[in-house]
UniProtKB/Swiss-Prot annotation:
The lineage of its organism: Archaea, Methanobacteriati, Methanobacteriota, Stenosarchaea group, Methanomicrobia. InterPro entries: HAD-like_sf, HAD_sf, PGPase. It comes from Methanothrix thermoacetophila (strain DSM 6194 / JCM 14653 / NBRC 101360 / PT) (Methanosaeta thermophila). This is Phosphoglycolate phosphatase. Its cofactor is Mg(2+). Substrate binds at residue 146.
Amino acid sequence: MIEAVAVDIDGTLTDASRVLSPVSVSVIRELEVPVILVTGNTHCFTRAAAVLFGVRHFVAENGGVISSDDRIEVVGDRKLCDEAYKHLKEKFNIKKFDSRYRLTDLVLIRGFDVDAASRYLESLNLPVDLVDTGFAIHIKNRGITKGTGLRRISERLGIPTKRIAAIGDSPSDIPMMEISGFPAAVGNAHPSVKSAARYVADRAFGEGFAEIIDHMRAAGMI
């Protein structure tokens, strides 16, 4: 039995233009189990989205910020990300999105060799990773993922992660899918995400999310 649903926002609850899908809002509001928003977006954005969805629990900044019933925990170290960006800028033609609202990671504009940049950071022995969310590249603390964030929320709720469904579209969602009891992917998901999923929706974006919830209901999971 599934006791909670963890779901990514961009690309999963939105359309292709990152506009929230009305059908996903309706589906979430009708769910009778707790919903956990798990995203790479900022804390302030995720908090606003939680209000729109009527959700009390979320993980923001790819696991760096956890909030449950307005109790916020910051677990990432922004200074390490700033140091990594300084080194990368000296060697690669990169630019970051300036956001004073980010607490634990940095966001880079796409268009550079991510694999080469990752290897360079490895050579410097900096405990950070580059993560592609499908919309941007994030510099984040190593060991902090959507999976670690979901685990913290599950502990607060007293719900084992194997009783939580995890739904997403990008590789950054895989860590939370791997620890969940029912990993699922929307139709527009990256191939690696589909491979990690137990169920892959035929439909994309918010419509795909609705399809997954319908499947879970039909199977008696929720």
